[in-house]
From Swiss-Prot:
Its main location: endoplasmic reticulum. It comes from Oryza sativa subsp. japonica. The keyword Endoplasmic reticulum applies. It is found in: Endoplasmic reticulum lumen. Disulfide bonds join C59-C62, C195-C198. The gene is PDIL2-3. Belongs to the protein disulfide isomerase family. It is an enzyme of class 5 (isomerase). NCBIfam families: pdi_dom. The record marks G60, H61, G196, H197 as: Contributes to redox potential value. This is Protein disulfide isomerase-like 2-3. It catalyses: Catalyzes the rearrangement of -S-S- bonds in proteins. The record marks R258 as: Lowers pKa of C-terminal Cys of second active site.
Length: 441
């Protein structure tokens, strides 16, 4: 009996050791447990907000988080999904999402790349963060920015197939103009039509391009048709994904997971890393108007007082204020420009500025031919709120009466203005009768 008992005890011990302390979460836990088999259907195709904890059973911090995570799951039941994934058991899936430490909490929202939860590991902040994501999702749906089922089942069989891709087709004729001479961040897939891995990537690439539209440009090159580009960028296998950042002459390969969420997360990280410092440009002519305002979603135009009224010190304070605002919105497709009072008379007339009331600001949408004036004080908080409101669609937008005429003007030299002194004259001289005297009778 004793050998049998000993053997049984060994089996039990082995079972306990093998059973993942895994089970940080039991079958009856309110925390759902995901794996590679159900991750896509439960997370990527979900219609709602999903919070996923990537954990390792042996991780002390993960064990401390377990009761907190379960309580948060209970509070959020029916509002948001709270789940966990054993990253130790499913290393490949964890690597796709760049998991390097435990626990890592990622929040998945339909139609957007996942974001890391960086807050305190306590029930209240976790729940509050989840609710903020839910509210943002609902707000987007109300505003028509995403459909109610954007992350779930396809609503129509053909619409998905016929929808044009947001990835731009690149070739030897347009590559330099669109990519290498551009200031934008580009991520380009070099593919071959017959390549199986490329076909597998295609729907993920299309999804990433759609979600990143307006932020990061994605393009694709058919290497069967574009051998010169393939050779120039030393493409030897398919698909090859190259990142064209600030240094367009030295693109580097993307080596992350070939899924939309990973591509999107990487692209947004690169966008932040490559973001140019914010600028507030002077509106000195038609070219400046075209460059700064024509392509921007919204162009915020400030009309500053004449240099004789504010002097250089005052004007610089206004420009510093505008730079602070631009910094807050540097990830948004906005531009900020300024002009001095009276320099762009037709523009002032069209937007109801001029004669008095400097400084002033308007939100200008050149494509729609509309504008909205700042009706509050020219101060940081008020301007910041004005920019946010304009980004949400604005209130009280007014139509432009045609295209404003922008005239060429000299840029400000950074100095105080010079008062032009007129020649002094004597009132007696002005009133004197200088007509010749006639002595004749």
């Amino acid at each position: 009996m004793r050998p049998a008992v000993a053997a049984a005890l060994l089996l039990v011990a082995a079972a306990v050791a093998a059973s993942p302390v895994s089970a940080l979460y039991s079958a009856g836990s309110p925390v759902l447990q995901f794996n590679p088999n159900n991750f896509k259907s439960k997370v990527l195709n979900s219609n709602g907000v999903v919070l996923v904890e990537f954990f390792a059973p042996w991780c002390g911090h993960c064990q401390q988080l377990t009761p907190i995570w379960e309580k948060a799951a209970g509070v959020l039941k029916g509002v948001a999904t709270v789940a966990a994934l054993d990253a130790d058991a499913h290393k490949e899936l964890a690597q796709e999402y760049g998991i390097r430490g435990f626990p890592t909490i990622k929040v998945f929202v339909p139609g957007k790349p996942p974001v890391d939860y960086q807050g305190a590991r306590d029930v209240k902040p976790i729940v509050e963060f989840a609710l903020s994501q839910v509210k943002a999702l609902l707000r987007d749906r109300l505003n028509g920015k995403t459909s109610a089922g954007s992350g779930g089942k396809k609503s129509g069989g053909s619409s998905e197939k016929t929808e044009p891709s947001a990835s731009i087709e690149l070739n030897s004729q347009n590559f330099d103009k669109l990519v290498t001479k551009s200031k934008d961040l580009w991520i380009v897939e070099f593919f071959a039509p017959w390549c199986g891995h490329c076909k597998k990537l295609a729907p993920e690439w299309k999804k990433a391009a759609k979600n990143l539209k307006g932020q990061v440009k994605l393009g694709h090159v058919d290497c069967d048709a574009e051998k010169s580009l393939m050779s120039k960028y030393k493409v030897e296998g398919f698909p090859t994904i190259l990142v064209f950042g600030a240094d367009k002459e030295s693109p580097f390969p993307y080596q992350g997971a070939r899924v939309a969420s990973a591509i999107e997360s990487f692209a947004l990280e690169q966008l932040e890393a490559n973001a140019a410092p914010p600028e507030v440009s002077e509106l000195t002519g038609p070219d400046a108007m075209e460059e700064k305002c024509a392509s921007a979603a919204i162009c915020f135009v400030s009309f500053l007082p004449d240099i004789l009224d504010s002097k250089a010190e005052g004007r610089n304070k206004y420009l510093e204020l505008l730079l602070s605002v631009a910094e807050k919105f540097k990830k948004s497709p906005y531009s900020f420009v300024w002009t001095a009072a009276g320099k762009q008379a037709d523009l002032e007339k069209q937007v109801g500025v001029g004669g008095y009331g400097y400084p002033a600001m308007v939100a200008l949408n050149v494509k729609k031919g509309a504008y909205a004036p700042l009706r509050s004080a020219f101060q940081l908080d008020e301007i910041t709120e004005f920019v946010k409101e304009a980004g949400r669609g604005g209130k009280g937008n007014l139509p432009l009466d045609g295209t404003p005429t922008i005239v060429q003007s000299e840029p400000w030299d950074g100095k105080d203005g010079e008062v032009i002194e007129e020649d002094e004259f004597s009132l007696e001289e002005l009133m004197a009768d200088n007509s010749p005297v006639n002595d004749e009778l």
